[in-house]
């Protein structure tokens, strides 16, 4: 080996000390996700290298990327000790989890998973697991991200994969369809098997719940009797006769049927778009005579500062999130109301926006979870943006949820890298009076004397070096543009 060859190999080799492995992928024998120099890679285990290289050579990976099923993935010539192959993934800017999705988003992810499984089946492949944590939303579009979940057909019991799909997709969707979205999202925090059959029956009508209970107990009893009277060998043969291996045609037919069933589930607000926002979404790039002063000021800030990423801390008025997205920013829009999130998600899909809408309250962002709270990163790390928009928010946080100015500013400041655009509401504003009438028996006179523009500005000055006042449309309201 000459000197030039050795130098080239050294350049391609990744120093182990510079690698940061992803904490949530410890149990995958096929490979491991890691970051290096800000980019996302996946090391492939030696026993899988030939198989995954073959997927590239056969054009399967390219096909899955072109159809929008799989996140962009490239084969590299990089080397890392302990791995036979290194892949590079396009990094999706905002990492979101199923417990923050609307019902329509979970359904989009379920249909993507089934479409991918159908495509894989035609190539003699399958997924070794089928749960929503394998999907990320790239703006408003779902993408499958777990490359090493793709394995040869028949390597994993199909029944186990299907059962996982039902518990992590079908059952939550049915729960949401019955109006229990908040409960479904809470249970989706369990990554593996979040919703068990008996948990789903809790939201059924009483008569249906009784039938489910009887059927479940009967099935358990039959299985128990079979285990006692039939030896293991004959029992395995009997299982093979009752549930013979699926042919390719039968597997495809089953997946197509499951897809039709999933598509038929009607989750709340699935196809809704707020009419006023639909009309306005087309004129957010260039000012028009119909714009109010607040829209003009926000548009001016977005066009002058050109933030690459924007977080909207409250998104009931979709105009501002849409404006940021159409001006070129990657946007994540938070709101505690699923209806608002579903409306914005539907609008984003229709307008092809790089905008991710999530069910989340800025007062209670999702924490880190899993081993050492590292398997799932906290929202404050995942959604930190160049700019935070805090419009139509302050009166509710202070006068409804009893936060003070320090708490409000700190909650917002932790999400921004550089700018915060906050709207201040004066005492006489109707929005303030809506939450805190002049005569409030619960609070003594003078309880909110600290609430003033000067007081808020002093708190903001502890976190930001410059604060600029901009006009809003209502009398006395002020937009405060804060910069670190």
Explain the meaning of each model-derived region.
Residues 126, 131-179:
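Catalytic activation segment of kinase domains across protein kinase-like and atypical kinase folds
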Residues 317-329:
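Conserved SAM-binding loop of SAM-dependent methyltransferases across substrates and taxa
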Residues 330-335:
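Conserved SAM-binding motif I beta-strand of class I
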Residues 343-382:
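S-adenosyl-L-methionine
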Residues 389:
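A conserved beta-strand element that flanks and buttresses the S-adenosyl-L-methionine
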Residues 396-411:
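A short, conserved alpha-helix within the catalytic core of class I
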Residues 411-427:
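Conserved beta-strand signature within the Rossmann-like core of class I S-adenosyl-L-methionine
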């Amino acid at each position: 080996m000459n000197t030039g060859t050795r130098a080239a190999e050294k350049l391609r080799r990744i120093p182990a000390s510079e690698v940061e492995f992803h904490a949530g992928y410890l149990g995958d024998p096929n490979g491991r996700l890691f970051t290096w120099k800000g980019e996302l890679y996946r090391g492939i285990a030696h026993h899988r290298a030939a198989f995954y290289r073959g997927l590239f050579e056969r054009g399967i990976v390219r096909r899955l990327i072109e159809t929008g099923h799989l996140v962009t993935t490239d084969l590299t010539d990089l080397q890392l000790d302990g791995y036979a192959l290194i892949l590079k993934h396009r990094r999706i800017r905002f990492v979101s989890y199923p417990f923050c999705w609307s019902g329509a988003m979970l359904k989009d992810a379920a249909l993507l998973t089934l479409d991918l499984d159908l495509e894989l089946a035609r190539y003699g492949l399958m997924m070794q697991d089928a749960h929503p944590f394998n999907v990320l939303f790239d703006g408003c579009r779902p993408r499958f991200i777990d490359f090493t979940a793709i394995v040869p057909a028949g390597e994993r019991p199909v029944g186990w994969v299907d059962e996982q799909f039902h518990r992590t997709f079908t059952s939550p969707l049915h729960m949401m369809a019955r109006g229990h979205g908040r409960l479904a999202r809470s249970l989706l925090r369990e990554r593996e098997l979040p919703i068990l059959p008996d948990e789903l029956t809790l939201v059924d009508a009483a008569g249906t719940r009784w039938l489910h209970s009887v059927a479940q107990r009967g099935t358990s009893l039959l299985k128990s009797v079979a285990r006692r009277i039939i030896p293991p060998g004959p029992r395995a043969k009997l299982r093979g006769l009752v549930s013979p291996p699926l042919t390719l045609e039968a597997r495809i037919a089953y997946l197509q049927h499951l897809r039709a069933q999933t598509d038929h589930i009607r989750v709340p607000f699935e196809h809704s778009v707020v009419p006023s926002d639909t009309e306005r979404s087309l004129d957010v790039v260039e000012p028009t005579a119909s714009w109010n002063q607040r829209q003009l000021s926000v548009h001016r800030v977005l066009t002058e500062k050109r933030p690459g990423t924007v977080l909207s801390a409250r998104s009931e008025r979709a105009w501002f999130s849409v404006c940021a997205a159409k001006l070129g920013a990657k946007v994540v829009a938070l709101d505690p109301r699923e209806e608002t999130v579903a409306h914005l998600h539907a609008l984003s899909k229709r307008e092809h926006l790089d905008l991710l809408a999530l069910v989340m309250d800025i007062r209670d962002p999702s924490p880190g979870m899993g081993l050492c709270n590292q398997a799932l990163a906290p929202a404050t790390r995942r959604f930190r943006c160049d700019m935070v928009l805090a419009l139509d928010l302050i009166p509710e946080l202070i006068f409804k949820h009893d936060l003070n100015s320090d708490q409000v500013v700190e909650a917002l400041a932790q999400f921004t890298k550089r700018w915060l655009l906050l709207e201040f509401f004066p005492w006489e504003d109707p929005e303030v009076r809506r939450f805190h009438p002049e005569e409030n028996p619960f609070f003594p006179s003078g309880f909110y004397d600290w609430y003033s523009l000067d007081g808020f500005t002093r708190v903001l000055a502890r976190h930001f070096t410059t604060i600029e006042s901009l006009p809003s449309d209502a009398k006395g309201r002020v937009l405060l543009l804060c910069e670190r």
